[in-house]
Swiss-Prot record:
Record's compositionally biased regions (Basic and acidic residues): 15-34
Binding of an acyl-CoA, residues: 415, 418, 421, 425, 433, 445, 456
Native source organism of the sequence: Macaca fascicularis (Crab-eating macaque)
Protein name: Sterol O-acyltransferase 1
Primary location class: endoplasmic reticulum
Catalytic site positions: 460
Keyword Ligase: no
GO biological process: one example: cholesterol homeostasis
Motif FYXDWWN motif: positions: 403-409
Post-translational modification N-acetylmethionine, affected residues: 1
Tissues/organs with expression: Expressed in most tissues, but most strongly in the adrenal gland. Expressed more strongly in liver Kupffer cells than in hepatocytes.
Amino acid sequence: MVGEEKMSLRNRLSKSRENPEEDEDQRKPAKESLEAPSNGRIDIKQLIAKKIKLTAEAEELKPFFMKEVGSHFDDFVTNLIEKSASLDNGGCALTTFSILEGEKNNHRAKDLRAPPEQGKIFIARRSLLDELLEVDHIRTIYHMFIALLILFILSTLVVDYIDEGRLVLEFSLLSYAFGKFPTVVWTWWIMFLSTFSVPYFLFQRWATGYSKSSHPLINSLFHGFLFMVFQIGILGFGPTYVVLAYTLPPASRFIIIFEQIRFVMKAHSFVRENVPRVLNSAKEKSSTVPIPTVNQYLYFLFAPTLIYRDSYPRNPTVRWGYVAMQFAQVFGCFFYVYYIFERLCAPLFRNIKQEPFSARVLVLCVFNSILPGVLILFLTFFAFLHCWLNAFAEMLRFGDRMFYKDWWNSTSYSNYYRTWNVVVHDWLYYYAYKDFLWFFSKRFKSAAMLAAFAVSAVVHEYALAVCLSFFYPVLFVLFMFFGMAFNFIVNDSRKKPIWNVMMWTSLFLGNGVLLCFYSQEWYARQHCPLKNPTFLDYVRPRSWTCRYVF
């Protein structure tokens, strides 16, 4: 519809340019009729009608004009970024044209693995929500969430006062979830110090001795084996053992496991980005070995990115008020989630546990879990991907704040996966998807996409299994099977608004399914414990067979 109106508008404009005389002749009678006096006066009604008509035409033209201007501006900025990237490192970087020419001559293209400067390009930019919250209409939605939090607090206080006869300000759920926090602290310090020292020491030792070694391949395999032992043995099994041996509560487990995954990904990126530089230096017989400094590696360990670079765009100053505001919002989101569980989830599952497991109970549970599930989704996104990452970016003067894009406008799941979490997506894209294509040939794009999905799904399921103390692969099934299917079926060719509605509907339903199934399983294991559980008892769903006893 818009396209037809746009074409008709262009046709009218082109006709007016082709026949200026006819157009002028047509305008003259109208002008004369407008200026013709009626009893010595201009027809005011006709003048007002003409003005209203011109205003309506201008309003019709306005969206087309703004859309054209926005399109041209986006093209201009994109071309500017591409030119800037091609001129990086004083013009020494490979251009897109040269890479494409090389690919024609070498189908496997293993020698054309892009050097670090040709991967992700970091530029100074603000987070999207920081820009949107400057608009009054968007900020009102933010205020609505704050008002909802106030109502949750009032509801909890009033109900507790009626039940207990006094104001109850105990946060028992929070204190339980974050229990045994000293264990979390010393475990994190061990993970950090080992990640800071071992990968850097191994890489430095390998890089300095590679060109001098008489057996460079054996030397590389030996150091690579030591690095894998560190990644799998120390960072892999160490934190997991602490979490299980000390029986930490869920939130404390999440902190350790997420930090474990973050350190593994950062160590991999550091080695992956710097090894090609050393190999190229040895091939060119350079006198200097490109080894990053300790300060550069330390900055990367805290920077809100999983892609290593020697330097990043930096802001000139730190806005400490902005940092304090971001951390305050993170703590506000924690309390928000607490009240959601307290007012929406706990009453729901208290009633569910009084009924035997059935299809009716399951369906009601899923649909009743949609609202709290969606609220938790929004709060998790806002607290971590916006507030937490922006707080550390501001403290480190890290310039590139594009931690997410406008995922809420997605009309396809492929676009949603790319824009929901840009930080993790970049790592998966360059080190799972692109490296798979580089190693196995660029003809297996579907297999490379499947590999990236598999890595993400397995890591998510591992985190949930360890943190909840049971294996219940609901997320894996939704992500690996339904997510993969939607990624191919509902692809980027779907642009109509109805697909955005479908995306939101399935996202809401999926979050309801996750919250319902995992909460049911959690309550079932609390109320139907086994005396001597075997390994199969940890992977067999307890909620399917548990009958609650009171």
